[in-house]
A protein has these predicted regions:
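Acidic, low-complexity intrinsically disordered regions
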Residues: 143, 214, 238, 242, ...
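Polar low-complexity intrinsically disordered regions enriched in Ser/Thr and small residues
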Residues: 21, 27, 31, 38, ...
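Short, surface-exposed loop and linker segments with low hydrophobicity and enrichment for Pro/Ser/Thr
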Residues: 137-140, 393-394, 432-436
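N-terminal capping segments
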Residues: 247-357, 403-405, 416-418
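Low-complexity, Gly/Ser/Thr/Pro-rich intrinsically disordered linker/tail segments
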Residues: 431-450
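Membrane-proximal envelope biogenesis segments
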Residues: 4-8, 22-25, 29, 33-291
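...with weaker cross-activation on analogous glycine-rich loops/strands in unrelated enzymes
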Residues: 335-338, 345, 353-427
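Lumenal/extracellular segments of secretory-pathway membrane and secreted proteins
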Residues: 1-18
Length: 450
């Protein structure tokens, strides 16, 4: 029995070595033409003096490649304190952001799909078609996520300085393919909205991106290495802090003000320019949401929370929504709701001519709070377009930001924010609220107060 096990173990070892040799050949051949930048290059450079060639080869195959594709190798392998090389420290910080973006893709995919489905349901409801049930068929698998990581990494040749969380999310958004349809449930008048999210075709995606044979080979090598190494399971825990809190920023115990009305109508008579998107109308929109006591439900952006949408949200987010189901049903069902960044996106996506809130409309992307703030920083100038709260100018319609949360500055030292499930849309003082920064949203115009 032991001899049989030993023989099987030896055969398995030989097979593993054979696969490793084959993988090493493919990786080396592809890397020779595609180039390996960022963490892989720095890791090799810094570890050459201490590693013999065999160990270096094992490092390349078993550690560097799977980790550098999407995680912060310098932080994990060297640590911040074990390397004084400025380029490695910089690379570590950038790799943490990239790794976090990749490891957030599972939630990103879910929230993106959620936003799309929410928008489709709202369109049907606005056209007079009552949706009784929502069913989502998501056929995407872990392999799709691995292909997204591999193809995107190959497209940037592993150059961490050329990559960003925003670019990764834009790329992932472009890979989503969906098809909505309506059906009668069991032949009854009950209407079901069915949305199918399709799997990606890596060959078609690489063709669309103009990959040559070398780039295809490199992406394939990265995919196989990620899959064989189990890198997602091994290193995903390093980025748990990037997972969203679906219940909002409800831990605040300071003074908050609620509105005194309850109305689902959106009155654009207060807008200074309904046909454009600007800061003054954003502030007016936010104030109106507060006055009318809009609720908070993750993944909504000014939509009326119907029975079918609520049922879908409970299924989609059993913790963040399901755990608060009784409270939401008692307080927010049948009313307009938004999450923190959804309050801002709802204004941007509102078509003032039809009074419909679309999806990713009018140039405003479907970003979370952190991504929206980063986009503003990327597009602006510090001190003029973004900065710390202590430097904030007196301009209504600025976005206020803290990690994972956003609000709208309305002037006079006050903000409107969709605070959390149990708070809804509230008015708070900026001072003492813990805001970390402010920014001008790059997707709307900023007008002066007359």
């Amino acid at each position: 029995m032991d001899e049989k096990d030993n023989s099987r173990s030896s055969l398995q070892t030989a097979a593993d070595l054979g696969r490793a040799a084959k993988a090493a050949y493919r990786i080396a051949q592809a890397a020779a033409v595609s180039g390996v930048h960022g963490a892989a290059a720095a890791a090799v450079k810094e570890t050459v003096p201490a590693l013999i060639k065999f160990l270096l080869a094992v490092l390349l195959i078993m550690i560097v490649i799977p980790m550098v594709v999407f995680t912060a190798l310098p932080n994990i392998f060297f640590g911040y304190d074990s390397s004084n090389t400025a380029s490695v420290i910089h690379m570590t910080e950038q790799a943490m952001r990239i790794g976090g973006a990749y490891m957030s893709l599972d939630d990103f995919e879910r929230t993106q799909i959620d936003s799309i489905v929410t928008g489709i349901a709202a369109e049907y409801e606005a056209d007079g078609t009552a949706i009784d049930h929502i069913e989502v068929k998501n056929t995407m698998k872990e392999d799709d996520l691995l292909w997204i990581i591999a193809i995107n990494s190959a497209a940037y040749e592993q150059d961490l300085d050329a990559m960003s969380a925003e670019l990764i999310q834009n790329f992932c958004r472009s890979t989503l393919s969906y098809q909505p349809s309506l059906s009668l449930l069991g032949g009854s008048p009950s209407t079901t909205l069915e949305v199918e999210i399709k799997r990606i075709d890596p060959e078609e995606l690489m063709e669309q991106m103009g990959f040559n044979e070398d780039a295809r080979q490199w992406a394939g090598a990265l995919f196989e290495t990620l899959k064989d190494s189990g890198a997602l399971e091994k290193y995903g825990g390093y980025f748990s802090a990037y997972q969203p809190d679906y219940s909002g920023d409800g831990s605040y115990s300071g003074d908050i003000q609620h509105g005194t009305s309850y109305d689902n109508d959106i009155d654009i008579s207060r807008f200074v320019s309904p046909s454009t998107k600007n800061n003054l109308d954003l502030a007016a929109y936010a104030v109106q949401a507060w006055e009318n006591n809009w609720g908070y439900v993750w993944g909504t952006y000014g939509n009326i929370l119907t029975e079918s949408l609520f049922a879908y949200k409970k299924q989609q987010y059993p913790d963040g929504v399901g755990n608060y189901a009784d409270f939401i049903e008692a307080n927010w069902l049948g009313r307009r709701t938004a999450d923190c960044i959804g309050l801002i996106k709802g204004y941007a996506w509102l078509d003032a001519s039809t009074m419909r809130i679309g999806y990713a409309a009018n140039g405003m992307p479907d970003y979370g709070a952190d991504q929206m703030y980063q986009a503003a920083k990327n597009a602006g100038i510090q001190g003029t377009d973004y900065g710390t709260v202590s430097s904030m100018p007196e301009i209504p319609g600025l976005m206020l930001w803290k990690s994972g949360h956003a609000g709208v500055y309305i002037g006079g030292g006050y903000a409107i924010e969709a605070m959390g499930t149990r708070k809804g849309v509230v008015k708070t003082e900026v001072s003492g609220r813990g805001w970390q920064g402010w920014c001008k949203l790059p997707y709307i115009d900023y007008l002066e107060v007359e």
